[in-house]
């Protein structure tokens, strides 16, 4: 079996390549193409067609996205291209080469006012990122009607710079010791990128066997936490001072972040069978520990969505 993972240089894509490691897997990057990654501009239909024509995959996974708030605000054309145009072109390419497609989307398509959200709940994105993710879903469905759209909540996992995820950025703030206010209203469901990748792998298997699930699937960890609660968990686990941490409501007050966009996963669980949930309390220490030193690099090329 052959798989192509678009966006394999990113947080999720890197774990996806591992999860599909028993297949012949080709990963693409754009600005980061170290190792075996192939450089592909996903806003170029020709570049996508060339790659898919060469690799002839059974399954395509699209992890391309532009989730940096600085780009939504400052370079909307680029953010739209990375989120919407790339999604449409990859979906067209997958259909043309006869591969099944899993397209990664986000819980930010919901407004967070009435959780839990089912795959057929009415989306109502609050910010540009959520609107782009929703527009991308529509484009994918039109271009490749049998694609599976997998919506995920905020992810954590091994990172290359602290700001690559909310969790590692918060860990850095806890360790830095400077006064910091963290939102204590919006509830997130941090999900390990390896768990998301494993679910995607299982979903891909089901699709390749020719099964047709609903076009949208949800996956999420079960434990809900605010950023402030995550900070306290980190401080407690590593015996760090917590007096500089203040509970705030910045994300909620801004009005463009869902307060609670919990995704209901029962449909996908029924289709896949038992899936091992990775428990946040058990997983987070290994992920944050390397970032608890003030010397660790905070910013890399990419900045996490808020
Ligand atoms: N991270 C989260 O918390 C989260 C939560 C829910 C859903 N998602 C969704 O999951 C997907 C993956 O997210 P992520 O966190 O892994 O993102 P990420 O770390 O920012 O990685 C994004 C990937 O997209 C690639 N890319 C961006 N523009 C491209 C272009 N024009 N052509 C080709 N590749 C391009 C990047 O390549 P280079 O870096 O090499 O340029 C990178 O491989 C996205 O759809 C995102 O919206 C993420």
Segments (PLM) and residue ranges:
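NAD(P)H-binding glycine-rich loop region in Rossmannoid oxidoreductase-like domains
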Residues: 42-82
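Active-site Tyr-X1-5-Lys
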Residues: 124-148
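NAD(P)-cofactor binding segment of oxidoreductase domains
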Residues: 74-102
């Amino acid at each position: 079996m052959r798989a192509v993972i678009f966006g394999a240089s990113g947080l999720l894509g890197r774990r996806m390549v591992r999860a599909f490691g028993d297949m012949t897997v080709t990963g693409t990057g754009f600005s980061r193409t170290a190792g075996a990654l192939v450089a592909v501009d996903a806003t170029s239909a020709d570049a996508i067609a060339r790659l898919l024509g060469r690799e002839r995959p059974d399954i395509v996974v699209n992890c391309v996205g532009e989730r940096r708030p600085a780009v939504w605000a400052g370079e909307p054309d680029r953010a739209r291209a990375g989120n919407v145009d790339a999604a449409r072109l990859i979906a067209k390419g997958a259909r043309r080469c006869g591969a099944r497609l899993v397209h990664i989307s986000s819980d930010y398509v919901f407004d967070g006012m009435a959780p839990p959200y089912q795959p057929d709940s009415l989306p109502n994105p609050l910010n540009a990122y959520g609107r782009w993710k929703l527009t991308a879903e529509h484009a994918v469905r039109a271009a490749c009607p049998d694609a599976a759209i997998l919506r995920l909540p905020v992810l954590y996992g091994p990172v290359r710079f602290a700001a690559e995820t909310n969790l590692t950025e918060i860990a850095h703030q806890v360790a830095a010791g400077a006064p910091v206010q963290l939102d204590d209203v919006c509830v997130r469901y941090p999900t390990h990128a390896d768990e998301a990748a494993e679910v995607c792998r299982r979903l891909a298997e089901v699709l390749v066997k020719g099964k047709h699930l609903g076009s949208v699937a949800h996956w999420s960890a079960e434990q809900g936490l605010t950023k402030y609660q995550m900070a306290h968990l980190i401080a407690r686990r590593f015996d760090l001072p917590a007096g500089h941490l203040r509970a705030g409501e910045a994300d909620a007050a801004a009005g463009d972040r869902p307060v609670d966009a919990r995704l209901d996963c029962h449909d996908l669980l029924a289709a896949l069978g038992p899936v091992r949930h990775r428990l946040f309390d058990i997983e987070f220490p290994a992920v944050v520990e390397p970032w608890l030193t003030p010397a660790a690099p905070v910013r890399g090329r990419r900045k996490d969505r808020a």
